[in-house]
Structures are given as C-alpha cells and as structure tokens.
C-alpha cells in the first residue's frame, strides 16, 4: 500500500518519469509524462482514498502502466480512469472532458469518439464505470492516445446490443460478423470494453475486449485459433506457465481482444490474449518467476522487465499479489510479442478476483446474450 504522503497524480507521474528514464525514451518520455499530468489535472490534490475505487488496476488504483517486452524500441503505456473526488466513478462528466483536451492540445481525432459519446457515456449508467483513457509512446515517435468504453452501461445483458449500436454509429456494422465469430460460448464469452485509437490514421484501430468466463485453456486457444499465428499448442503452453500449471480460468476470466478492421485485412495481428496475474499465484515473486520462464530465451526482454518492475514495485514481491495485473501475448514473425501490465498498488495488497471495484457487480456468472444468438 502506498503511503499517502503525496497526491495520486504526482506519485504516478514520478513513476512514469522513472520508467521512461529506464527505457531511455528521452524527450518523448518527457512529453509523455506531461500528457499524463494534463489528463489527470482534474484529480487535483486527491490522495488515493479521496478518489472512488477504479477498475484500471485490480486494487482500485486509477492508473496502470504497461511496457512492451519485445523489439528494439520499447513502448511505454499508461491507462487512467477519469475520476472526481466525492463523485461515483460511473459519473460521465470527467470522462467527457478528456476528449476535448486531447483534441485541442494534442490533435487527437475525436470523430469516432463523438459518434459514440452520448450513447456510451450516459448520465444514468448501470455499471460502476464508464470509460478509461490512455497513451503510448516510443522514443522519437509521437504519443498515441486511445479511449475505452465499458459495454455494460445499459446493464449486463445489454453488451451485445450496445456494441452493435456503436458499430452502427461508426458506419462499421459490416464488422459485426467478426464479433459473432469470436463468441464460441454464448453467455460466457462476453464483450466488456470497446476501444478506439484516437487518430485519423487509416490504420487506427477499433478493438473489442472479451472476458471468457469459466473457460479452460483449450477453449481460449480455440477462440484464438481463427487468427493467423495463434497455434493452439503455443497458447496453451503460455497460459499454463503463467497460471502455474492450472488449466482453467476458474477465478478470474481470461481476456482476449480483437481489432475489428485488422481481422478482415490480416495486415496486422488482429487478436491479443491477456492472462490475469493477480489471482493464480501466491505472490508477485511467483509471478516474476513465471515471467522469467516465459522470457528465458530473450535476455534483453528479461532485463527490460526486471528493470521496470524494480522501479514500480514499492514492497517485497513475496508480500502478496497486486503489482502484476496482466501479461499479453501475440504471435510474431520471429518471436511472440508480450506486454506486461503493472499497478501502482495504491490500496491493499492481494486484490480479489475481478478487482475491488467489480467484485460485487460481477460476483455472479455473467450471462450477456443478444445478437450473436
């Protein structure tokens, strides 16, 4: 648990500064941290317990850091939830205010966001959260911004219909078959996030994230088998290593995402697997050992991971879980692409399955159904 001697904004900005320095991002890292400060200015002098519990990290912290573990040019990413002290996280006002800031100051493209905002950022949201925003940077490259919308804002059974409505508003209903094909188990393979790259680049992505409730590793591998490069044996092996030999995602569902446009062109890898790390290990030291096993063949990736982890962790790794959120996996031409997602852990160690902000809302089996049936 972080000592509440500084504000959430300052504490997380310092961690980003240190991580950017570790990754040798130079001036790009400085601009990146400045963007984080601008996007979190509305937090003001709030300390961790002044803000409502967030869904960004499982312990309720409103920030998550992510580092690409492959490639010569490392990428650093953050995600944040627009929150206001004393106001429920589902309130959309703070979320609506971020997009004009990004468009006006950084030239982010608001076209798709504007088509969706009144539908996906409602005043009477059913779920506990409505949106997240994030940014990613590499040395010498411009900052790329993105937004995530929660798909349960009209209720847990409305996710598919809301997603179809979102595609309709963007003029992309021709992509609906991609969503349908990704659902292998009706009522258990459930879309819960829609993300947009906030760019007018033709390659800007529209991604849908799915939770796969009570799936075993074979069922997850079967979902991903449809996408080039996802060999079922490799997916199963990766999951088993990161889950300590377990075969079923019994406590915390696996997550996959599909980039809808890429799924039709195959120019880029269309899918990503995310394995949750805080529920299938005794402590973060055990998670670190599993990451080491996965990265053993790539010493430069292992060094990058250890260096970043050392700068973010502020307690002994054997004290519990909660520093590691997820690890993602995609096939690559010469090696898999992996990214590790880490928490500032501003609240308690060892968060529960689904995270502290979702444990009651999602405590039962999700049974979202709709147009896929």
From Swiss-Prot:
Q: Which molecular-function annotation in GO is an example for this chain? A: transferase activity, transferring alkyl or aryl (other than methyl) groups
Q: What does the record note as the disruption phenotype of the gene behind this chain?
A: Eliminates cyclomarin and cyclomarazine production and significantly reduces the levels of desprenylcyclomarin C. Accepts exogenous analogs of N-(1,1-dimethylallyl)-tryptophan including N-(1-propargyl)-tryptophan to produce the corresponding cyclomarin and cyclomarazine derivatives.
Pfam families reported for this sequence: Trp_DMAT (PF11991)
For this protein, the Enzyme Commission number is 2.5.1.-
Q: Where does L-tryptophan bind?
A: 55-56, 64, 211, 326
Phylogenetic placement of the source organism: Bacteria, Bacillati, Actinomycetota, Actinomycetes, Micromonosporales
Q: Give start and end of each FtsK domain.
A: 346-373
This chain belongs to the protein called: Dimethylallyltryptophan synthase CymD
Catalytic residues at: 64 (nucleophile (probable))
- Gene encoding this polypeptide? cymD
Native species: Salinispora arenicola (strain CNS-205)
Role description: Dimethylallyltryptophan synthase; part of the gene cluster that mediates the biosynthesis of cyclic heptapeptides, known as cyclomarins and also of cyclic dipeptides, called cyclomarazines, which have both antimicrobial and cytotoxic effects. Catalyzes the reverse N-prenylation of monomeric L-tryptophan with dimethylallyl diphosphate (DMAPP) to form N-(1,1-dimethylallyl)-tryptophan (r-N-DMAT).
- Keyword field contains ATP-binding: no
Q: Does the keyword Repressor apply?
A: no
In which residues is dimethylallyl diphosphate bound? Answer: 77, 146, 148, 205, 207, 274, 337, 339, 341
Q: Which GO terms describe its biological process?
A: alkaloid metabolic process
The main enzyme category here is transferase
Q: Which UniProt keywords apply?
A: Transferase
């Amino acid at each position: 648990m972080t000592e509440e001697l500084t504000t959430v904004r300052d504490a997380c900005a310092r961690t980003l500064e240190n991580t950017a320095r570790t990754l040798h991002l130079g001036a790009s890292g400085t601009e990146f941290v400045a963007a984080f400060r601008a996007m979190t200015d509305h937090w003001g002098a709030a300390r961790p317990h002044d803000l409502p519990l967030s869904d960004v990290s499982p312990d309720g912290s409103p920030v998550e850091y992510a580092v690409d573990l492959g490639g010569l040019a490392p990428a650093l990413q953050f995600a944040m939830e627009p929150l206001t002290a004393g106001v429920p996280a589902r309130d959309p006002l703070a979320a609506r205010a971020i997009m004009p800031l990004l468009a006006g100051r950084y030239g982010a493209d608001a076209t798709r966001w504007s088509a969706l905002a009144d539908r996906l950022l409602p005043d009477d949201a059913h779920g506990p959260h409505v949106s997240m925003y994030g940014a990613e940077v590499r040395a010498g490259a411009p900052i790329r911004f993105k937004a995530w919308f929660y798909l349960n804002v009209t209720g847990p059974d409305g996710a598919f219909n809301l997603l179809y409505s979102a595609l309709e508003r963007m003029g992309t209903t021709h992509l609906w078959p991609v969503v349908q094909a990704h659902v292998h188990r009706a009522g258990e393979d459930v879309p819960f996030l829609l993300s947009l790259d906030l760019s007018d680049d033709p390659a800007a992505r529209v991604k849908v994230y799915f939770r796969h409730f009570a799936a075993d590793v074979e069922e997850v591998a079967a979902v991903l088998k449809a996408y080039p490069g996802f060999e079922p044996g490799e997916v199963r092996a990766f999951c088993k290593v990161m889950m300590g030999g377990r075969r079923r995602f019994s406590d915390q569902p696996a997550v996959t995402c599909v980039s809808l446009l890429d799924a039709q062109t195959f120019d880029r890898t269309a899918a990503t697997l995310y394995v949750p790390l805080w529920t299938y290990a005794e402590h973060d030291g055990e998670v670190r050992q599993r990451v080491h096993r996965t990265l053993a063949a790539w010493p430069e990736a292992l060094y990058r991971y250890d260096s970043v982890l050392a700068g973010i962790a502020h307690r002994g790794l054997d004290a519990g879980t909660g520093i590691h959120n997820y690890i993602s996996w995609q096939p690559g031409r010469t090696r898999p692409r992996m990214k590790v997602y880490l928490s500032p852990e501003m609240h308690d160690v060892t968060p529960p399955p689904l995270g502290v902000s979702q444990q009651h809302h999602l405590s039962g089996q999700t049974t979202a159904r709709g147009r896929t049936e």
